[in-house]
Swiss-Prot record:
A cellular component term, taken from the record's GO annotations: cytosolic large ribosomal subunit
UniProt-recorded name of the protein: Large ribosomal subunit protein uL18
Biological role stated in the UniProt entry: This is one of the proteins that bind and probably mediate the attachment of the 5S RNA into the large ribosomal subunit, where it forms part of the central protuberance.
Presence of keyword Ribosomal protein: yes
Pfam families: Ribosomal_L5e (PF17144)
Gene behind this protein: rpl18
Complex formation: Part of the 50S ribosomal subunit. Contacts the 5S and 23S rRNAs.
Keywords: Ribonucleoprotein, Ribosomal protein, RNA-binding, rRNA-binding
NCBIfam families: PRK08569.1
Length: 195
């Protein structure tokens, strides 16, 4: 840490690497509604936030753990779960009266094809407008076809590794090769359950 009379200590959340205050400042100046997306090592969290001078107000939110209520048996943080969580949050935001929002990615550095954009794709598909350019969202990955193809290939080549890698899927009663069909079932369940 620097010493001397000219050293200014940064804000605590900046020191901890939790908040980019310049980006936060631009969001506050904009005063538009935001869709806040946070990816953890296990889960996906999506919140729709309105600006208020006293503090931000969360209007609608969804967590990838909630997908279990709709019959989801897959992983809670892959691209498919990201899309479903974004879709669920978008439907809830529409119910709350939000029609558009800007993306708040936090400290995440955007890269083409990242999971965070699958969340935004889900939000857009639910009917909430979010400005998003070409970010490499692949519809096959969105439905989990890449996982199903890999599982099929791995089961033939190395059954032990297959059972190890997909143990959570198998323990929950989902054959990973059936993930695209399961995705459609859960998406329909979300559509019917949230309207």
């Amino acid at each position: 840490m620097a010493h001397g009379p000219n050293y200014k200590v940064k804000y605590r959340r900046r020191r901890e690497g939790k908040t980019n205050y310049y980006r936060r400042y631009t969001y506050v100046l904009n005063r538009s509604d935001r869709v806040v997306v946070r990816l953890t090592n296990k889960y996906v969290i999506v919140q729709f936030v309105k600006f208020d001078p006293k503090g931000d107000i969360t209007v609608a939110a969804a967590h990838s753990r909630e997908l279990m209520k709709f019959g989801w048996k897959g992983d809670e943080n892959n691209s498919t779960a990201c899309y479903l969580t974004g879709y669920l949050a978008g439907l809830r935001a529409k119910k709350a009266g939000m029609t558009s929002a800007s993306a708040d990615l936090g400290l995440f550095t955007p890269t083409k094809g990242a999971r965070i954009f699958y969340v935004l794709k889900g939000v857009i598909d639910s009917g909430v407008k979010v400005p998003m350019g070409d970010v490499g969202v692949n519809n096959d990955r969105l439905a989990g076809k890449h996982i199903a193809e890999y599982a099929k290939k791995l089961e033939q080549e190395d059954p032990d590794k297959y059972r190890g890698l997909f143990s959570r899927y198998l323990a929950r009663g989902l054959d990973p090769k059936d993930l695209p069909a399961h995705f459609k079932e859960v998406l329909n369940s979300i559509k019917s359950g949230e309207k």
